[in-house]
């Protein structure tokens, strides 16, 4: 079962997205701010992280940078999520270390396609490094 770390401070968004992911067969772990997301990424070892970019304590931009700078979490794919579909946000998310980017409200099939692609890429990379 694919483990998703959902880092989202908005209870309604967190509830709605997690229920939809669970119905599609994902295991979901929650964090409500960027620091908690970093801590849970280290302890829970998720397959993918869905990172809201507007978070308290440490925002998603900085949390993504820290995750990608940490040997323990750098290989975990991060998908940045934001309600702001501004020009340049995707590029900003990639520069912050996100592997992909999506807008809210989330279109679930599109998001799952991104998750599956990134998990496949991460597993391929892990196999190459193991050889």
Which role fits each region the language model picked out?
Residues 8, 32:
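Conserved acidic carboxylate
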Residues 15-23:
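Charged docking surfaces used in two-component/phosphorelay signaling
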Residues 44-50, 55:
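Active-site beta3 strand of CheY-like receiver
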Residues 56, 74, 86:
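The feature encodes the CheY-like receiver
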Residues 106-115:
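C-terminal output helix
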């Amino acid at each position: 079962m694919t483990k998703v770390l959902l880092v989202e401070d908005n209870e309604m968004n967190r509830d709605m997205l997690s229920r939809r992911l669970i119905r599609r067969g994902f295991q979901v772990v929650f964090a409500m701010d960027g620091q908690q997301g970093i801590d849970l990424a280290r302890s829970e070892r998720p397959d993918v992280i869905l990172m809201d970019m507007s978070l308290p304590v440490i925002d998603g931009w900085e949390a993504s940078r820290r995750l990608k700078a940490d040997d323990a979490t750098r290989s975990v794919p991060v998908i940045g999520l934001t309600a702001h579909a501004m020009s340049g946000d995707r590029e900003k998310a990639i520069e912050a270390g996100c592997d992909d980017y999506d807008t809210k409200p989330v279109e679930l099939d599109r998001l799952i396609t991104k998750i599956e692609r990134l998990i496949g890429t991460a597993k391929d990379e892990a196999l190459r490094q193991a050889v």
